[in-house]
């Protein structure tokens, strides 16, 4: 084998190893703005004011993640969010908190409306909460966790 081929194989191997190492690292932040950006893939819109946030993405290629977000928004923004994501008010009340440890700041009371994507699916734990009086919202969204 020529030296050129050996060098090429070494470079490809090195790039492959580097790719595997980088793609196997989790993403984790307790910064609300970064959490929003990792989750949404976009900048924070002017209509919302971030208060707290946490985001964790597993190192797996399947893109498993968990988001906790507290923010304030106007009613119009949240209504559009509910419609776009096809959320409905949770009337069943599944134990969506039972499989996760919520951050200490993730606290709602009975004034919050709780929305879900599919409340009949006992394994669908993502919830979207809004206090219509204060405009405070919480998002707990999980995929594959």
Regions flagged by a language model, labelled:
Residues 2, 40, 78, 97-100, ...:
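Short linear interaction motif-like sites in intrinsically disordered regions of transcription factors
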Residues 83-145:
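Extracytoplasmic electrostatic interaction patches
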Residues 3-4, 24, 43, 117:
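Compositionally biased regions
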Residues 2-5, 61, 129-131:
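A general structural signal for short secondary-structure junctions and capping/turn motifs
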Residues 21, 38, 58-61, 114, ...:
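Intrinsically disordered, low-complexity segments
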Residues 14, 43-44, 107:
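A generic structural signal for short, non-catalytic loop/turn and secondary-structure boundary residues
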Residues 1-22:
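Sec-dependent bacterial lipoprotein signal peptides
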Residues 24-80:
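N-terminal export/targeting and maturation segments
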């Amino acid at each position: 084998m020529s030296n050129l081929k050996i060098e090429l194989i070494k470079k490809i191997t090195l790039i492959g190893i580097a790719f595997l190492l980088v793609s196997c690292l989790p993403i984790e932040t307790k910064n609300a703005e970064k959490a929003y950006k990792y989750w949404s893939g976009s900048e924070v819109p002017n209509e919302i004011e971030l208060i707290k946030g946490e985001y964790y993405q597993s190192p797996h290629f399947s893109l498993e993640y968990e988001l906790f977000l507290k923010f304030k928004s106007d009613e119009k923004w949240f209504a559009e969010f509910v419609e776009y994501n096809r959320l409905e008010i949770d009337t069943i009340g599944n134990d969506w908190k039972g499989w996760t440890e919520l951050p200490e700041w993730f606290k709602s009371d009975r004034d919050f409306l709780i929305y879900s994507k599919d409340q009949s699916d006992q394994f669908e734990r993502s919830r979207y909460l809004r206090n219509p009086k204060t405009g405070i919202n919480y998002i707990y969204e999980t995929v594959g966790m």
